[in-house]
From Swiss-Prot:
Biological source species: Neisseria gonorrhoeae (strain ATCC 700825 / FA 1090)
Family membership noted in the UniProt record: Belongs to the IspF family.
Pathway it works in: Isoprenoid biosynthesis; isopentenyl diphosphate biosynthesis via DXP pathway; isopentenyl diphosphate from 1-deoxy-D-xylulose 5-phosphate: step 4/6
Gene, per the UniProt record: ispF
Job description of the protein: Involved in the biosynthesis of isopentenyl diphosphate (IPP) and dimethylallyl diphosphate (DMAPP), two major building blocks of isoprenoid compounds. Catalyzes the conversion of 4-diphosphocytidyl-2-C-methyl-D-erythritol 2-phosphate (CDP-ME2P) to 2-C-methyl-D-erythritol 2,4-cyclodiphosphate (ME-CPP) with a corresponding release of cytidine 5-monophosphate (CMP).
Binding-site positions, a divalent metal cation: D11, H13, H45
Protein name according to UniProt: 2-C-methyl-D-erythritol 2,4-cyclodiphosphate synthase
Reactions catalysed according to its record: 4-CDP-2-C-methyl-D-erythritol 2-phosphate = 2-C-methyl-D-erythritol 2,4-cyclic diphosphate + CMP
Length: 160
């Protein structure tokens, strides 16, 4: 049996008026927020998918369906911690997390240190093991038109 595994996660949510913008568990001041059943934290959803995928446990939708009332407006940090408990129960531990958030606006750099701290705390790893890169889409496509925000994540697990 393999002692290391890598998982890849992806999420995208539409930007809309009347919602808070939450990424990496951080509320970011912006005129729009992400539309979703939960708090729509695309970054944490991508990390959660990467964790579950690496452990062979499906995806975020199979664990926390958007049709379930108990996950309406759910805090994605709570979902991430619950998913990681399932991963640990299978005998896996996170080595590192590398992510990319693609958003034309707002600028993410001022918020990245707190996002990293949140993810590190939720996974019980050192902040140096969490990386977040903020990118724009150079005004191309739906991301460039500020219709949504996309997140990608890679997670390395080791057998414990």
């Amino acid at each position: 049996m393999t002692n290391i595994r890598i998982g890849q996660g992806y999420d995208v949510h539409q930007l809309t008026e009347g919602r808070k913008l939450i990424l990496g568990g951080v509320e970011i001041p912006f005129e729009k927020g992400l539309l979703g059943h939960s708090d729509a934290d695309a970054l944490l959803h991508a990390v959660t998918d990467a964790l579950l995928g690496a452990a062979g446990l499906g995806d975020i939708g199979s664990h926390f369906p958007d049709t379930a009332a108990e996950f309406k407006d759910a805090d994605s940090r709570v979902l991430l911690r619950a998913a990681y408990q399932s991963v640990q129960a299978q005998g896996w531990q996170v080595v590192n997390v590398d992510t990319t958030v693609i958003a034309q606006k707002p600028k993410l750099a001022p918020h990245i240190p707190q996002m990293r701290a949140n993810i590190a705390a939720d996974l019980g790893i050192d902040i140096s093991c969490v990386n977040i890169k903020g990118k724009t889409n150079e005004k191309l496509g739906y991301l460039g038109r500020m219709e949504g925000i996309e997140a990608q994540a890679a997670v390395l697990l080791v057998r414990i």
